[in-house]
Amino acid sequence: MKDNTKEKLKQWLGENNQIGMDIWEKKYRYNNESFDEWVDRVSGGDAKLRQLISERKFLFGGRALANRGTNKKGSMFNCYSSGYVPDNIEGIMQLNTNLALTYKAQGGQGVSLSKIRPKGTPIGNEFKSDGIVPFMEIFNTTTSSISQGGARKGALMISLDIMHKEAETFITIKSNEDRITKANLSLEINDEFMDAVQKYYDWGETVVIHESREYNGHPIEYDVVPIKLYKLMVETVYDWGEPGCIFTNRFRNYNLMEFDDDYQIETCNPLTDKNMRI
Protein backbone atom coordinates (compact mmCIF):
# COMPACT_ATOMS: atom_id res chain seq x y z
CA MET A 1 0.00 0.00 0.00
CA LYS A 2 1.24 3.44 -0.88
CA ASP A 3 2.39 6.17 1.57
CA ASN A 4 1.32 5.34 5.14
CA THR A 5 -2.00 3.76 4.20
CA LYS A 6 -1.16 0.43 5.80
CA GLU A 7 -0.40 2.02 9.16
CA LYS A 8 -3.46 4.29 9.08
CA LEU A 9 -5.68 1.39 8.11
CA LYS A 10 -4.23 -0.69 10.92
CA GLN A 11 -4.96 2.09 13.41
CA TRP A 12 -8.49 2.48 12.07
CA LEU A 13 -9.33 -1.24 12.04
CA GLY A 14 -7.37 -2.20 15.11
CA GLU A 15 -4.19 -4.22 15.57
CA ASN A 16 -4.01 -7.81 14.32
CA ASN A 17 -6.98 -7.37 12.00
CA GLN A 18 -5.52 -8.83 8.84
CA ILE A 19 -8.91 -10.06 7.69
CA GLY A 20 -10.30 -6.53 7.87
CA MET A 21 -7.33 -5.15 5.95
CA ASP A 22 -7.75 -7.79 3.25
CA ILE A 23 -11.45 -7.03 2.91
CA TRP A 24 -10.79 -3.30 2.63
CA GLU A 25 -8.14 -3.92 -0.03
CA LYS A 26 -10.25 -6.31 -2.11
CA LYS A 27 -13.74 -4.86 -1.73
CA TYR A 28 -13.63 -1.18 -0.86
CA ARG A 29 -10.38 0.31 -2.13
CA TYR A 30 -10.69 2.03 -5.52
CA ASN A 31 -7.84 2.47 -8.00
CA ASN A 32 -5.10 2.00 -5.39
CA GLU A 33 -6.27 5.04 -3.42
CA SER A 34 -4.69 5.85 -0.07
CA PHE A 35 -6.64 5.52 3.15
CA ASP A 36 -7.07 9.31 3.35
CA GLU A 37 -8.28 9.41 -0.26
CA TRP A 38 -10.73 6.63 0.51
CA VAL A 39 -12.19 8.52 3.49
CA ASP A 40 -12.44 11.68 1.36
CA ARG A 41 -14.23 9.78 -1.41
CA VAL A 42 -16.66 8.00 0.88
CA SER A 43 -17.47 11.17 2.86
CA GLY A 44 -18.08 13.12 -0.34
CA GLY A 45 -16.03 16.05 0.87
CA ASP A 46 -18.18 16.57 3.98
CA ALA A 47 -15.77 17.46 6.80
CA LYS A 48 -18.12 16.40 9.62
CA LEU A 49 -18.87 13.09 7.94
CA ARG A 50 -15.18 12.55 7.29
CA GLN A 51 -14.45 13.02 10.99
CA LEU A 52 -17.20 10.60 12.02
CA ILE A 53 -15.84 7.93 9.67
CA SER A 54 -12.26 8.54 10.81
CA GLU A 55 -13.36 8.15 14.43
CA ARG A 56 -15.39 5.03 13.58
CA LYS A 57 -18.57 6.66 14.85
CA PHE A 58 -20.36 6.23 11.52
CA LEU A 59 -19.91 4.06 8.45
CA PHE A 60 -21.95 3.49 5.32
CA GLY A 61 -22.96 0.06 4.09
CA GLY A 62 -20.58 -1.84 1.86
CA ARG A 63 -21.94 -0.69 -1.49
CA ALA A 64 -21.52 2.98 -0.60
CA LEU A 65 -17.98 2.29 0.66
CA ALA A 66 -17.14 0.61 -2.62
CA ASN A 67 -19.02 2.80 -5.10
CA ARG A 68 -19.50 6.35 -3.83
CA GLY A 69 -17.43 8.88 -5.73
CA THR A 70 -16.35 6.38 -8.40
CA ASN A 71 -17.32 5.83 -12.02
CA LYS A 72 -18.86 2.47 -11.18
CA LYS A 73 -22.50 1.82 -12.04
CA GLY A 74 -23.10 -0.08 -8.82
CA SER A 75 -25.83 0.70 -6.30
CA MET A 76 -25.35 2.77 -3.15
CA PHE A 77 -27.58 0.39 -1.19
CA ASN A 78 -26.78 -3.17 -0.18
CA CYS A 79 -30.24 -4.71 -0.24
CA TYR A 80 -33.76 -4.25 -1.54
CA SER A 81 -37.08 -6.07 -1.39
CA SER A 82 -39.58 -6.78 -4.16
CA GLY A 83 -42.27 -7.79 -1.69
CA TYR A 84 -44.85 -10.36 -2.73
CA VAL A 85 -44.22 -12.41 -5.86
CA PRO A 86 -47.33 -12.00 -8.08
CA ASP A 87 -49.46 -15.09 -8.68
CA ASN A 88 -49.17 -14.97 -12.46
CA ILE A 89 -46.44 -16.00 -14.88
CA GLU A 90 -45.94 -12.51 -16.31
CA GLY A 91 -45.42 -10.99 -12.88
CA ILE A 92 -43.15 -13.82 -11.78
CA MET A 93 -40.89 -13.46 -14.82
CA GLN A 94 -40.78 -9.67 -14.47
CA LEU A 95 -39.77 -10.05 -10.84
CA ASN A 96 -37.06 -12.51 -11.88
CA THR A 97 -35.75 -9.85 -14.28
CA ASN A 98 -35.76 -7.33 -11.43
CA LEU A 99 -33.70 -9.73 -9.34
CA ALA A 100 -31.11 -10.04 -12.10
CA LEU A 101 -30.89 -6.27 -12.60
CA THR A 102 -30.52 -5.71 -8.86
CA TYR A 103 -27.69 -8.25 -8.67
CA LYS A 104 -26.02 -6.60 -11.65
CA ALA A 105 -26.01 -3.34 -9.68
CA GLN A 106 -24.47 -5.15 -6.67
CA GLY A 107 -27.65 -5.25 -4.59
CA GLY A 108 -29.42 -8.10 -2.82
CA GLN A 109 -33.14 -8.89 -2.91
CA GLY A 110 -35.90 -10.22 -0.68
CA VAL A 111 -39.15 -11.75 -1.96
CA SER A 112 -42.21 -13.41 -0.42
CA LEU A 113 -43.94 -16.39 -2.06
CA SER A 114 -46.97 -16.10 0.21
CA LYS A 115 -49.33 -15.03 -2.59
CA ILE A 116 -48.34 -17.89 -4.93
CA ARG A 117 -51.02 -20.57 -5.21
CA PRO A 118 -49.99 -23.94 -3.76
CA LYS A 119 -49.33 -27.10 -5.70
CA GLY A 120 -52.48 -28.69 -7.09
CA THR A 121 -54.51 -25.47 -7.19
CA PRO A 122 -56.34 -24.99 -10.53
CA ILE A 123 -54.94 -22.68 -13.20
CA GLY A 124 -57.80 -21.70 -15.47
CA ASN A 125 -60.09 -24.62 -16.26
CA GLU A 126 -57.64 -27.27 -17.45
CA PHE A 127 -54.37 -27.24 -15.54
CA LYS A 128 -53.07 -27.31 -11.99
CA SER A 129 -50.26 -25.33 -10.41
CA ASP A 130 -46.88 -26.87 -9.64
CA GLY A 131 -46.71 -24.65 -6.57
CA ILE A 132 -43.89 -22.62 -5.10
CA VAL A 133 -40.90 -24.91 -5.68
CA PRO A 134 -40.34 -24.32 -9.43
CA PHE A 135 -40.22 -20.57 -8.83
CA MET A 136 -37.84 -20.98 -5.91
CA GLU A 137 -35.59 -22.88 -8.29
CA ILE A 138 -35.84 -20.18 -10.97
CA PHE A 139 -34.91 -17.45 -8.50
CA ASN A 140 -32.13 -19.64 -7.10
CA THR A 141 -30.64 -20.10 -10.59
CA THR A 142 -30.82 -16.38 -11.33
CA THR A 143 -29.08 -15.59 -8.05
CA SER A 144 -26.36 -18.11 -8.81
CA SER A 145 -25.85 -16.89 -12.37
CA ILE A 146 -25.75 -13.10 -12.04
CA SER A 147 -22.66 -11.60 -10.49
CA GLN A 148 -23.01 -8.35 -8.56
CA GLY A 149 -21.07 -6.11 -10.89
CA GLY A 150 -18.31 -8.70 -11.09
CA ALA A 151 -17.70 -8.22 -7.37
CA ARG A 152 -19.73 -11.00 -5.80
CA LYS A 153 -22.71 -13.29 -6.40
CA GLY A 154 -26.25 -12.18 -5.69
CA ALA A 155 -27.91 -12.38 -2.27
CA LEU A 156 -31.52 -13.55 -1.98
CA MET A 157 -34.02 -13.96 0.85
CA ILE A 158 -37.15 -16.02 0.11
CA SER A 159 -39.94 -16.01 2.68
CA LEU A 160 -43.29 -17.79 2.98
CA ASP A 161 -46.34 -17.45 5.21
CA ILE A 162 -46.25 -20.39 7.62
CA MET A 163 -50.02 -20.78 7.09
CA HIS A 164 -49.45 -21.39 3.36
CA LYS A 165 -50.45 -24.87 2.24
CA GLU A 166 -46.88 -25.65 1.12
CA ALA A 167 -45.20 -24.51 4.34
CA GLU A 168 -44.01 -28.03 5.14
CA THR A 169 -42.30 -28.33 1.74
CA PHE A 170 -40.69 -24.93 2.25
CA ILE A 171 -39.41 -25.87 5.71
CA THR A 172 -37.67 -29.04 4.56
CA ILE A 173 -36.52 -28.14 1.06
CA LYS A 174 -32.94 -27.36 2.12
CA SER A 175 -32.52 -30.82 3.60
CA ASN A 176 -31.79 -31.70 -0.02
CA GLU A 177 -28.41 -30.01 -0.41
CA ASP A 178 -28.67 -29.81 -4.20
CA ARG A 179 -31.91 -27.82 -4.47
CA ILE A 180 -32.00 -24.26 -3.12
CA THR A 181 -28.36 -23.36 -2.59
CA LYS A 182 -28.24 -19.60 -3.30
CA ALA A 183 -31.00 -18.22 -1.09
CA ASN A 184 -31.74 -17.79 2.59
CA LEU A 185 -35.20 -18.96 3.65
CA SER A 186 -37.48 -17.56 6.35
CA LEU A 187 -41.02 -18.27 7.50
CA GLU A 188 -43.49 -15.43 8.05
CA ILE A 189 -45.04 -16.26 11.43
CA ASN A 190 -48.02 -14.43 12.94
CA ASP A 191 -49.30 -14.24 16.50
CA GLU A 192 -52.18 -16.63 15.83
CA PHE A 193 -49.69 -19.37 14.97
CA MET A 194 -47.50 -18.73 18.01
CA ASP A 195 -50.52 -18.54 20.34
CA ALA A 196 -51.56 -21.98 19.11
CA VAL A 197 -48.07 -23.32 19.79
CA GLN A 198 -48.12 -21.80 23.28
CA LYS A 199 -51.43 -23.53 24.07
CA TYR A 200 -49.81 -26.87 23.33
CA TYR A 201 -46.95 -26.24 25.76
CA ASP A 202 -49.17 -24.64 28.43
CA TRP A 203 -52.18 -26.95 28.35
CA GLY A 204 -51.35 -29.81 26.00
CA GLU A 205 -53.95 -28.52 23.54
CA THR A 206 -53.37 -29.27 19.86
CA VAL A 207 -54.95 -26.38 17.96
CA VAL A 208 -56.12 -26.92 14.38
CA ILE A 209 -56.60 -23.80 12.26
CA HIS A 210 -58.89 -24.05 9.25
CA GLU A 211 -57.65 -21.95 6.34
CA SER A 212 -59.83 -20.73 3.45
CA ARG A 213 -58.00 -18.98 0.63
CA GLU A 214 -58.78 -17.98 -2.92
CA TYR A 215 -56.38 -17.80 -5.86
CA ASN A 216 -57.73 -15.99 -8.91
CA GLY A 217 -61.25 -17.27 -8.36
CA HIS A 218 -60.23 -20.76 -7.23
CA PRO A 219 -61.06 -21.34 -3.53
CA ILE A 220 -59.14 -23.89 -1.48
CA GLU A 221 -59.57 -25.07 2.09
CA TYR A 222 -57.17 -26.96 4.34
CA ASP A 223 -56.19 -27.41 7.97
CA VAL A 224 -52.99 -26.18 9.60
CA VAL A 225 -51.69 -27.81 12.79
CA PRO A 226 -49.29 -25.18 14.21
CA ILE A 227 -47.53 -27.43 16.72
CA LYS A 228 -46.75 -29.95 13.97
CA LEU A 229 -45.19 -27.28 11.76
CA TYR A 230 -43.41 -25.71 14.72
CA LYS A 231 -41.74 -28.96 15.72
CA LEU A 232 -40.76 -29.67 12.13
CA MET A 233 -39.29 -26.17 11.84
CA VAL A 234 -37.27 -26.54 15.06
CA GLU A 235 -35.91 -29.93 14.01
CA THR A 236 -34.99 -28.66 10.55
CA VAL A 237 -33.29 -25.55 11.90
CA TYR A 238 -31.31 -27.70 14.33
CA ASP A 239 -30.13 -29.99 11.51
CA TRP A 240 -29.71 -27.48 8.66
CA GLY A 241 -29.63 -23.96 10.11
CA GLU A 242 -32.72 -22.80 8.22
CA PRO A 243 -35.42 -21.58 7.81
CA GLY A 244 -35.33 -18.41 9.86
CA CYS A 245 -38.35 -16.67 11.41
CA ILE A 246 -39.99 -13.36 10.51
CA PHE A 247 -42.51 -12.43 13.19
CA THR A 248 -44.93 -10.42 11.09
CA ASN A 249 -47.06 -8.84 13.81
CA ARG A 250 -43.91 -7.51 15.44
CA PHE A 251 -42.30 -5.90 12.45
CA ARG A 252 -45.58 -4.55 11.07
CA ASN A 253 -46.68 -2.99 14.35
CA TYR A 254 -43.37 -1.93 15.90
CA ASN A 255 -41.59 0.31 13.41
CA LEU A 256 -41.12 4.03 12.86
CA MET A 257 -43.90 4.12 10.24
CA GLU A 258 -46.50 2.02 12.06
CA PHE A 259 -48.98 4.92 12.27
CA ASP A 260 -48.86 5.65 8.53
CA ASP A 261 -51.84 3.83 6.99
CA ASP A 262 -50.19 3.92 3.56
CA TYR A 263 -47.15 2.04 4.86
CA GLN A 264 -47.19 -1.75 4.92
CA ILE A 265 -44.14 -3.96 5.44
CA GLU A 266 -44.38 -7.07 3.29
CA THR A 267 -41.14 -8.95 3.82
CA CYS A 268 -37.42 -8.64 4.53
CA ASN A 269 -34.31 -8.41 2.43
CA PRO A 270 -31.19 -10.56 2.96
CA LEU A 271 -29.78 -8.19 5.57
CA THR A 272 -32.69 -9.28 7.81
CA ASP A 273 -32.45 -6.23 10.05
CA LYS A 274 -33.98 -3.95 7.43
CA ASN A 275 -37.65 -4.63 6.67
CA MET A 276 -38.92 -3.27 3.41
CA ARG A 277 -42.13 -1.88 2.06
CA ILE A 278 -43.41 -1.92 -1.52
What spans do the regions from the language model cover?
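Extended catalytic cores of very large enzyme megasubunits
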Residues: M1-I278
